[in-house]
Amino acid sequence: MRNINIAIINYECGNIHSARKAFELALTELDISGSVTVTNDPEIIFKADKLVLPGVGAFSECFNKLKSVKGLSESITERVHDHGVPILGICIGLQLLADKGFENIESKGLGWISGQVENLCPDDKNLKIPHMGWNEVNFKRDDGRFSDLNGEDFYFVHSYYFNAKNTIGTDFRILIWTSSIKLYTERVMEIA
């Protein structure tokens, strides 16, 4: 079995400790040889087999911090787009892949996935924002990757959602599969 090198991208907007611990536990539990490195060094990112982009905070602030580290967003883009390295965006980490976001101010995103991050405004005014609590997740289209998760409960804490352009309706997306995946969940270790 080959060694898997996972790089968790540190741009000062993520719950880095929890992400690192979750991936270290997943490697151990699944008996996979590998390493988990927290980094903002483009050279380490170029050597990684898998990338993780966590994120906590406001969209525009996180985007600006990501862009402020010299060569960071360019190295991530090259690894994902040119070399096909998979990336897992967690919370705002996935949202940053959108064209733009509207948290506090309108802000440009990386533009990797068509769509925008919008305020969660339910039709039912009795529903509270931020959306917090356990909810059942149902997949509209499942190619089998997530069949074990359909109907499972996940914990949500958010006020914004990724409105992908290739979908319609009022449901909000918690997972968009392209070269990335995102789950709003505190159960990352259990799922892994």
Short names for language-model regions:
Residues 98-100:
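Short glycine-enriched nucleophile-adjacent loop
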